[in-house]
C-alpha cells in the first residue's frame, strides 16, 4: 500500500513516515498544501493522510479539489481541529475518516487497515 502524508509539522510528518515504513507501507511526505495537491492528483496512492491546516492551501481545499476531479483515493484527515462541527465539515468535504491530534499510533494503523479492507472488498471469515 502506498500512502501520501501531507503534513506541515516536520516532526510529526517524519514520525508518521517512520511508523508507516516500519509497518511495511510505502510512504511519500510533503509539507505544503500545493505540493500535496500535486502529489495526490497523480493517482498513484492508495491512501492519503491529510492535515487541514497547511501552508499555501488548506487540507479541505485539497480534499474538495480532489473530489471535484473525481479522484476517489481514500483520505484520513489528521488534524488538531476536534470540534464536532470540524469533524462534520471534514467528512462532508469528502474525507473517509477523521482523526483528531493527538492520536495513538495503534488507532491510526487500525483505521488504515479498515480503509484498506474496504477498498479491497475484504470479506473476513467469522
Predicted regions and their residues:
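N-terminal/domain-start alpha-helical segments
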Residues: 1-122
